[in-house]
Amino acid sequence: MIALEEKITTLPTLFVEKRDGRRVVFDVDKIDKALHKAADKVMDVTPLVEKRLNALTERIVTEIHSRFPQGVKIYEIQNIVEHELLEAKEYALAEEYI
């Protein structure tokens, strides 16, 4: 996980617009925790699964920063997470996440 955090922390600060209109600093840990929470419910989280989750988180964060450098709405983050899970054929994980 250290490599993931090091790579992600080099990205510029991004703000997230919440459903109630508040703007907060983007926190990659929230995505990571949500993916792990969903994974815990549908599979054994082995070191291999942990590696896949880290790779997914990295792809999700990269996509968010590339598409929304000026700020992102919370529903856009959710759409990207769902899309990346489906692209990775992580159907059970996607269903639990949704």
Where are these regions (language model features)?
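Long, C-terminal-biased catalytic regions of enzyme "large/alpha" subunits
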Residues: 1-98
